Amino acid sequence: MNSESVDSDVAASTSNKGNELCSSSTDITSLSVSSPNESVIHSSHSASEADEYVCKLSYEGNRKKRIYNGSAEAGKEKKLQKQRAQEERIRQKEAERLKREKERQQREQEKKLREQEKIAAKKMKELEKLEKERIRLQEQQRRKEERDQKLREKEEAQRLRQEQILNKERQQLKLNNFFTKGVEKRIAPNENFVADKTDELNEFEKEFRPFFIKHQMSLSKYPSPNESDSFLDEVLSTSKSYPLKLNDIFTPSDAVSSANSLGVSNRNSENEVRQLMSAYQDPSVSKPQEILSCLSQIPIKFIFFYQDVRPPYFGSYTKTHSHGSNVLLNPWLEDEDIDYTYDSEAEWVADEEDDGEDLESEDEEVDNSDDIVEDGDNAFVDDEDDDKDSVNASNTHRSSGPLEVIVEGPVWDSKFLPDFNCLSLIEPISSFSASTYLQIDPKEDLWASQDTAPASSGMTIGPTSSLSDDLQVRFPSEDIPKFIEYVRNSHDNKVFLIENLRHMFPYVTKNIISETLGKVAVRKGKSVSDGWIIKENFASLLSS
């Protein structure tokens, strides 16, 4: 309820009471007269005075009522203001409380965010640490792999060098059949040093040469229970008068166990290998890889002696000894199926002569006069005689060992070849003929007289050539600059250089290449880095 409604109600009640007082003036007069304490009022008052008095009282009452009503309204207004102020304070306190709550929540949220950031930073540091550790381990592993790779490459290079050395030795041994050894300059050994070295060697080292385990080899150990040093010392220091035998040291059980460890069995391994080889060569076999795996399990022997000139034997040996396992107890037992008097070393021994290298081969021991164009009726007659002499001389350099005869043919292809008769030539061109590679001049008159030879031959340099007499060689004049240029840039020895020149000039024979090489160039030295020097007479022919 507001103040205006209260004021209207108070005024209405006051006017009503005033009216009631005015209407009951008689009652008031009577009351005033009848009152024992009233001494002022007299009965003589008139009615008008009474009415005036009553109105005055009514007015005074109304004024007091109005004053009372105003004070009540002011109290109510103060009370309302106080209530509103209290409500305002409550609202402010609630707003402050909400503000503080909001700030507290915000601070808690910020604190949580800071904690999350700290946790994330800690996790990030841990991840970075793990990543650094992983990179360090990876780098360490990479360096280790690089070291291992370098070590493997070094071992592989060393193995390849050893194989190259062995292959070179084998090739050199094979080349000894075709080339004679030159005079080797041997330095006189120091006698004092040899004597001192001989004194240092004991009887065992003098009897048995040093042995080295090579690639793809393994040293088998004899499984004897009595091979300790103490037992051998006791046997060697014994004072018995009779000589010791192998049976006194090694028992038969040791021999049997040794035979089993070496892969010796009672089965006929020779026949087994032959069956495997025949099965592998059979085209109807569906799985040849299984046969190869069986062949790879056969033990391989490497037989080589330091005094041998021939290459060592490297392969399978499955023949059984005629004496069986007794050969394990007595290695000097001779097999009845082997001819020990035959010396195959003679096939590899070459005669030592001082004639130098012989570059002839069997397929070139023919007359090479057809490979050149004659410069007259009597051209190169002396050279042909020289070729015959060189062929006869090369025959003396051949090995004196027995030759194996191989007979092949005739082979008739009656099922396949008839279908292509219409496509074949009457006389096919031979790929081994030197005339196939000769260049044919399309402008040359082949039906002209043979007496009118061309001014400059393709295979010789005659008197009409631009070269002088001391520069005449039996080599195509147009290829001499190319020949000299290749020789000058080469570091190969004479044998390999001639072979390379043969591949470069297939239409020129080996004799002419060797002769031309000896005339135009000379080797600087014998080392690999040394090359060839072109003689001054042919230096002007180098291509610019």
From Swiss-Prot:
Residues 1-52, 67-117, 138-160, 351-400 are annotated as: Disordered. GO terms for biological process: DNA repair; DNA repair-dependent chromatin remodeling; DNA replication-dependent chromatin assembly; mitotic recombination-dependent replication fork processing; nucleosome assembly. GO terms for cellular component: CAF-1 complex; chromatin; nuclear replication fork; nucleus. Residues 56-170 are annotated as: Interaction with DNA and pcn1/PCNA. The keyword Nucleus applies. One of its GO terms (molecular function) is H3-H4 histone complex chaperone activity. Disruption phenotype: Viable vegetative cells but sporulation is inhibited. Decreases the level of pcf3 protein and decreases nuclear localization of pcf2. Abnormal heterochromatin organization at the peri-centromeric and mating-type regions; heterochromatin formation in the sub-telomeric region appears normal. Its main location: nucleus. Residues 325-396 are annotated as: Interaction with histones H3/H4. A motif (PCNA-interaction protein (PIP box)) lies at residues 172-179. Residues 74-117 have a biased composition (Basic and acidic residues). The keyword Coiled coil applies. Residues 351-388 have a biased composition (Acidic residues). InterPro entries: Cac1-like_C, CAF1A_DD. This is Chromatin assembly factor 1 subunit A.
